[in-house]
Design a protein with these regions (language model features):
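Charge-rich, low-complexity N-terminal segments
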Residues: 1-163
């Protein structure tokens, strides 16, 4: 029995965000940014479960959700909420962040705390894959693979569910 995988890699599947990677207990990158590109692969049900017209679902259903989701991370600072060395204090207008000997203050609407220990492409792709799978499994999507590229030719992908 055959299955089909839909490939979505639109030019507007992108977001620009600032972050820094934490390598170990002494080393971390400086705050910097990337223009990320995203590709999403959706494994559809078996061919017998396609519409009588021979297609799975209108691509626009997926494209709209993916684009809206990526827009949430566009022009924003992404920080790892679960790293033990990250300390956060919310004030009326800002988020104060202490990381080891560094201090930052960001406007509240310009920072997102992610439920991860590092803001690597590995973790970003995993968060997006989990989110897209939760959203799309109701349509019959069997598996989601998300590839996040931070620079041309350099990125990571995650697959949900794994098997």
């Amino acid at each position: 029995m055959s299955t089909t995988t839909l490939h979505l890699a639109k030019q507007n599947f992108k977001f620009s965000a600032a972050h820094f990677l934490i390598f170990d207990d002494k080393h971390a990158e400086r705050l910097h940014g990337h223009n990320y590109q995203v590709r999403v692969d959706l494994k559809t049900p078996a061919e017998k479960d396609l519409h009588a017209e021979g297609y799975f679902l209108d691509f626009n259903v997926f494209k709209k959700y993916i684009k809206a989701r990526l827009d949430q991370w566009d022009e924003i600072v992404l920080l790892p909420e679960k790293h033990p060395d990250m300390k956060f204090k919310k004030t009326a207008k800002s988020l104060e962040v202490t990381f080891r000997d560094r201090f930052y203050a960001f406007p509240l609407n310009e920072v997102i705390l992610l439920p991860v220990t590092n803001t690597s492409v590995e973790q970003l792709s995993k968060l997006l894959a989990e989110d897209f799978y939760r959203e799309f499994k109701g349509y019959g999507v069997r598996r989601v693979r998300v590839y996040v590229e931070e620079t041309r030719g350099q990125g990571a992908s995650s697959v949900v569910p794994e098997n």
